[in-house]
Amino acid sequence: MESANASTSAQSIDQLCKECNIPMHNLQILCVFCRKTLSTAEVYSFAYKQLYVVYRGNFPFAACAICLELQGKVNQFRHFNYAGYAVTVEEETNKSILDVLIRCYLCHKPLCHVEKVRHILDKARFIKLQDTWKGRCFHCWTSCMETILP
């Protein structure tokens, strides 16, 4: 990251840019996993996905696209609890499926209402990883299905 104040308490890319007075397209931040500098597109993607900046030694880090997907797959294998339909999620959380924060288990983007409804209409299950419900966003759903279909 370029000339940023390491004492910031920013939790998001947007907050970090505001507190450090750096335009988002000029932000240089390292991936917490591989230590490579995120591209401008990855910085914007990280912000769009509403992911949190993490701190190591008072220095902010994000995660690149490749590491996010890899971590998603690792979490799926290591921390899978069980799968359930929307009804199961609603019963467990005592909330409407539309009010539950559900992220994509691959790219970690929060699912919108339409993506949650697609799970219901297609009778697709949500998965519970480490006590958190996950699903698939449209982008990851399509890329997942492309590998299955001829």
UniProtKB/Swiss-Prot annotation:
InterPro entries attached to this UniProt entry: E6, E6_sf
Record's keyword terms, sorted: Activator, DNA-binding, Early protein, Host cytoplasm, Host nucleus, Host-virus interaction, Inhibition of host innate immune response by virus, Metal-binding, Modulation of host cell apoptosis by virus, Transcription, Transcription regulation, Viral immunoevasion, Zinc, Zinc-finger
KW Ribosomal protein (keyword) present: no
Record-annotated disulphide pairs: none
Entry keyword tRNA-binding: no
Compartments in which it is found: Host cytoplasm; Host nucleus
GO terms classed as biological process: DNA-templated transcription; regulation of DNA-templated transcription; symbiont-mediated perturbation of host apoptosis; symbiont-mediated perturbation of host ubiquitin-like protein modification; symbiont-mediated suppression of host innate immune response; symbiont-mediated suppression of host type I interferon-mediated signaling pathway
Membrane-traversing stretches: none
Domain of life, per lineage: Viruses
Major place of residence: host cell
Molecular functions (GO terms): DNA binding; zinc ion binding
GO cellular component assignments: host cell cytoplasm; host cell nucleus
Zinc finger extent (unnamed): 31-67, 104-140
Job description of the protein: This protein may be involved in the oncogenic potential of this virus (cervical neoplasia-associated virus). Plays a major role in the induction and maintenance of cellular transformation. E6 associates with host UBE3A/E6-AP ubiquitin-protein ligase and modulates its activity. Sequesters tumor suppressor TP53 in the host cytoplasm and modulates its activity by interacting with host EP300 that results in the reduction of TP53 acetylation and activation. In turn, apoptosis induced by DNA damage is inhibited. E6 also protects host keratinocytes from apoptosis by mediating the degradation of host BAK1. May also inhibit host immune response.
Family classification: Belongs to the papillomaviridae E6 protein family.
Subunit structure: Forms homodimers. Interacts with ubiquitin-protein ligase UBE3A/E6-AP; this interaction stimulates UBE3A ubiquitin activity. Interacts with host TP53 and EP300; this interaction inhibits TP53 activity.
Misc: Belongs to the low risk human alphapapillomavirus family. The cancer-causing human papillomavirus E6 protein has a unique carboxy terminal PDZ domain containing substrate but low risk E6s do not possess this domain.
Name of the protein in question: Protein E6
